[in-house]
Swiss-Prot record:
The chain crosses the membrane at residues 435-455. It comes from Macaca fascicularis (Crab-eating macaque). This is Dolichyl-diphosphooligosaccharide--protein glycosyltransferase subunit 1. Pathway: Protein modification; protein glycosylation. Residues 1-23 form the signal peptide. Belongs to the OST1 family. It comes from the Eukaryota. The modification N6-acetyllysine is found at K187, K538. The lineage of its organism: Eukaryota, Metazoa, Chordata, Craniata, Vertebrata. Subunit of the oligosaccharyl transferase (OST) complex that catalyzes the initial transfer of a defined glycan (Glc(3)Man(9)GlcNAc(2) in eukaryotes) from the lipid carrier dolichol-pyrophosphate to an asparagine residue within an Asn-X-Ser/Thr consensus motif in nascent polypeptide chains, the first step in protein N-glycosylation. N-glycosylation occurs cotranslationally and the complex associates with the Sec61 complex at the channel-forming translocon complex that mediates protein translocation across the endoplasmic reticulum (ER). All subunits are required for a maximal enzyme activity. Residues 24-434 are lumenal.
Length: 607
């Protein structure tokens, strides 16, 4: 008797289910979740929910076969969904991913998905499927701020029941936590607790769209590392190389560090900053070479590279540990051989590469921009992606020897996790003749260069010689040297005048004698140089030779007056000459000297 009664109860529950518009009607096959085993993995900063669902076709008055079924997301978590995948239990995962398409349900809010079954379900038949969902940023730190020595606790809120548009006959839920330290958790159905596990259920005869808040507050010191923004640039060359560069903005999205940071305590105490991030590992393709890792300052030498058989493991250690709320930025780049990723048949090319690659375990990428730079001349570009991505208008990129630019595919996606590490395929056409464009440009450039050099060396660009002009230039050069030497000689006189004045004040005869000796030596040298230049002017046939000769004679008179002034000063100091007489004589000497200097200036102006 119990089985018919339970069956009648479930049929009554099905009467309240609203089918999907367009995909189901009042004659939609009656489905039921016969058994659901749900696992909620909260051991990292992600919430991974896996449900093993035994889906049954009740049959009854309906004889139609079920070709698809509906999935619903919990209203509290639907906005943070990063990944949804459905597979048939017990079959090869790679070949058995079911087609999932988002849809709407009339009269119901929230997000719903239609899952296409691999084989139509007959009345009375069953099928076991595995529903995998991954949610990001649903574990909230509580308290939101902690000191360096405190541990991190988080709160998660979900649903005790499997949220579904179908009634569920029996269901259980196992919650896997990051530690055994649990502050509190909801007690619906007297759950059992063992170490870091919470087991709920079984819950029986659960109506469709049932909700009951599940909440747990527990210790979670796993790295709450989030890539807030990432730009991945892939540059393809048909000459055998693919260059990859990733610009990454990182942030610790756990509990914000409260108070100061002590590096001394951090190094001394193993449990200091237990929720901080010292380093993480990035897995690069096995063929990666010429790997570099740098930030705004420059190359970061604390990174380590380990080459394995199937990958290249890179340990990235930022310049400082990351605590809650702290950010950093870095760039990783490497080269790949194109023969492993680029395929062609004639002018048809296909590039098969990952849309996003591994950055760290349990990665979360809030915003990703991928730029694929194709060779110049690539046309008819199409993209095949395993999941939905957003395209921006194509751009152009210019580099060495480019003429009309390389096409750049720009694609965006938000909220990515490890499940998005899948290949995309870029199809395009490329005329192989264009591969000769750059070598021909180089050859043409060298040809033009050599031709220009040949023409240049065969042309005569020399200026016709003018003997008269050359003579004038030589005379001008000699005259310039004469002017310089005359000015130096006049400077000697001024310097000697200062020596005489110092002598009159100090009455030190050695100062005067030293000044006379210096004057005689330097004056003789300058006069000899001027005489040599005078002879060169005479050789050039210039009439300036006579003027220089006249200037030499005037200078001899100036020198004589300068020395006479010194003699008068000696007589004054020795008391052989009265001061009034000395002043009168000095006035006469200065007048004659000034007259001679004026004549010399006129000659210099004439030169």
């Amino acid at each position: 008797m119990e089985a018919p009664v339970a069956r009648l109860f479930l049929l009554l529950l099905l009467g309240s289910w609203t089918p999907a518009p367009g995909s189901a009607s009042s004659e939609a096959p009656p489905l039921i979740n016969e058994d659901v085993k749900r696992t909620v993995d909260l051991s990292s900063h992600l919430a991974k929910v896996t449900a093993e669902v035994v889906l049954a076709h009740l049959g009854g008055s309906s004889t139609s076969r079920a070709t698809s079924f509906l999935l619903a997301l919990e209203p509290e978590l639907e906005a943070r969904l990063a990944h949804l995948g459905v597979q048939v239990k017990g079959e090869d995962e790679e070949d058995n991913n079911l087609e999932v398409r988002e849809t709407k349900i009339k009269g119901k809010s929230g997000r719903f998905f239609i899952v296409k079954l691999p084989v139509a379900l007959d009345p009375g038949a069953k099928i076991s499927v595995i529903v995998e969902t991954v949610y990001t940023h649903v574990l909230q730190p509580y308290p939101t701020q902690i000191t360096q020595s405190e541990k991190q606790f988080v709160v998660f809120e979900g649903n005790h029941y499997f949220y579904s548009p179908y009634p569920t006959k029996t269901q259980t839920m196992r919650v896997k936590l990051a530690s055994r330290n649990v502050e509190s958790y909801t007690k619906l159905g007297n759950p059992t607790r063992s170490e870091d596990l919470l087991d709920y259920g079984p819950f029986r005869d659960v109506p469709a769209y049932s909700q009951d808040t599940f909440k747990v507050h527990y210790e979670n010191n796993s790295p709450f590392l989030t890539i807030t923004s990432m730009t991945r640039v892939i540059e393809v060359s048909h000459w055998g190389n693919i260059a990859v560069e990733e610009n990454v903005d990182l942030k610790h999205t756990g509990a914000v560090l409260k108070g100061p940071f002590s590096r001394y305590d951090y190094q001394r105490q193993p449990d200091s900053g237990i929720s901080s991030i010292r380093s993480f590992k990035t897995i690069l393709p096995a063929a990666a070479q010429d790997v570099y890792y740098r930030d705004e300052i420059g190359n970061v030498s604390t990174s380590h590279l380990l080459i394995l058989d199937d990958s290249v493991e890179m340990e990235i250690r930022p310049r400082f540990p990351l605590f809650g709320g702290w950010k950093t930025h870095y760039i990783v780049g490497y080269n790949l051989p194109s023969y492993e990723y680029l395929y062609n048949l004639g002018d048809q090319y296909a590039l098969k590469m990952r849309f996003v690659d591994h950055v760290f375990d349990e990665q979360v990428i809030d915003s990703l921009t991928v730029k694929i730079i194709l060779p110049e001349g690539a046309k008819n570009i199409e993209i095949d992606s395993p999941y939905e991505i957003s395209r921006a208008p194509d751009e152009l990129h210019y580099t060495y020897l480019d003429t009309f630019g390389r096409p750049v595919i720009v694609a965006y996606k938000k909220n990515l996790v490890e499940q998005h590490i899948q290949d995309i395929v870029v199809h395009y056409t490329f005329n192989k003749v264009l591969m000769l464009q750059e070598p021909l440009l180089v050859v043409a450039a060298f040809y033009i260069l050599f031709f220009t050099v040949i023409i240049y060396v065969r042309l005569d660009f020399s200026i016709t010689k003018d003997p008269a002009a050359e003579a004038r230039m030589k005379v001008a050069c000699i005259t310039e040297q004469v002017l310089t030497l005359v000015n130096k000689r006049i400077g000697l006189y001024r310097h000697f005048d200062e020596t005489v004045n110092r002598y009159k004040q100090s009455r030190d005869i050695s100062t005067l004698n030293s000044g006379k000796k210096s004057l005689e030596t330097e004056h003789k040298a300058l006069t000899s140089e001027i005489a040599l230049l005078q002879s060169r002017l005479k050789t050039e046939g210039s009439d300036l030779c006579d003027r220089v000769s006249e200037m030499q004679k005037l200078d001899a008179q100036v020198k004589e007056l300068v020395l006479k002034s010194a003699v008068e000063a000696e007589r004054l100091v020795a008391g052989k000459l009265k001061k009034d007489t000395y002043i009168e004589n000095e006035k006469l000497i200065s007048g004659k000297r000034q007259e001679l200097v004026t004549k010399i200036d006129h000659i210099l102006d004439a030169l």
